[in-house]
Amino acid sequence: MTAIPTISVDAMGGDLGPAAVVEGIGHALKRWPDRKATYLLHGDEALLAPLLARHPKVAAVCELRHTETLVQMTDKPSEAVRRARGSSMWNAIQSVKSGEAGAIVSSGNTGALMAIGKVILRMKKGVHRPAISANWPTPKGHTVVLDVGANVQCNATQLVEFAIMGEAYHRAVFGGEAPSVGLLNVGQEELKGNDTVREADQLIRKANLDIAYQGFIEGNDISAGGIDVVVTDGFTGNIALKTAEGTARLVAGWVRDALTSSLLAKLAAGLLSLGALERLRQRMDPRYINGGVLLGLKGIVVKSHGGADGEGFASALGLAYVMAQSDFMAQIRANLDKFASFEEQEVAAAS
């Protein structure tokens, strides 16, 4: 943990490219004026230098690392790994590997980011596949959901590893001593769900892990805030996340239309507290919870939404800052070791 962390940024990733990155750092400076950080911007100097010149406060906390090579959003992971050396994404991750930076943020190609991250940083011992986390707003704070897209299919062992990583991640980002953990299922009864989910449930119970496991939970439990960490495969998690984002935009649109539907509605809206309306807007705006961590790598890799604007990218930077300052890597170790030992004993007993 460092007093002033350095965050490495793939400045060429995402739909909006360098403009969103520079604007994002500016928003982060305004949103968290007490957070001191420096940024390594990996990208094309011809594009980044003019943007930094227009934002002197951003330029003051940034160091530009020039490269004209970038990973395209359409690149397949295998192709990206072969061609990515020297790219903005590769160099940004390499800065974490070398110890120059405590975390890396990218809005680029998710598959490529994961593949390159695995090549450069390698997987943590005891983790077979990385998982992408998402911070889900609830009336009680936030629920961590994983996986939300890294693995379309998972086996029971991988789901247990996700539970271990998600629990440690929740403690690192949101605090608390014993966040509750649940497996997403179609019902809470023991016989509900597919074989993989039921097997994962039994593995968690038998392994005697140091987590507050609550058993099966259902989709409606996520937004209620009754569970801190929700574990699922990437196929299910991604659909749930995208559905929630779409619903949030729909409801936000309804609220906006209701407050502007007539002169009387506009006058009533004007009487409401502007602060309250702003807080409501932020709670319903996916940009303010943008950013997921690729858990399981030997380094902090934060994935920003590919379409994130400056406000959204700032949220991903904020998450990277918190993770860089946390002891997540140490917190995850004990339960991974305990589960690995349990699996070895199970294999030995079966042989």
Curated annotation (Swiss-Prot):
Listed InterPro entries: FA_synthesis, Phospholipid_synth_PlsX-like
Cellular component terms (Gene Ontology): cytoplasm
A GO MF term: phosphate:acyl-[acyl carrier protein] acyltransferase activity
GO biological process, one term: fatty acid biosynthetic process
A Pfam family that the UniProt record links to this protein: FA_synthesis
Keyword vocabulary terms for this entry: Cytoplasm, Lipid biosynthesis, Lipid metabolism, Phospholipid biosynthesis, Phospholipid metabolism, Transferase
HAMAP family (alphabetical): PlsX
Homology family: Belongs to the PlsX family.
Protein name, per record: Phosphate acyltransferase
Species in which this protein is naturally found: Maricaulis maris (strain MCS10)
Lineage: Bacteria, Pseudomonadati, Pseudomonadota, Alphaproteobacteria, Maricaulales
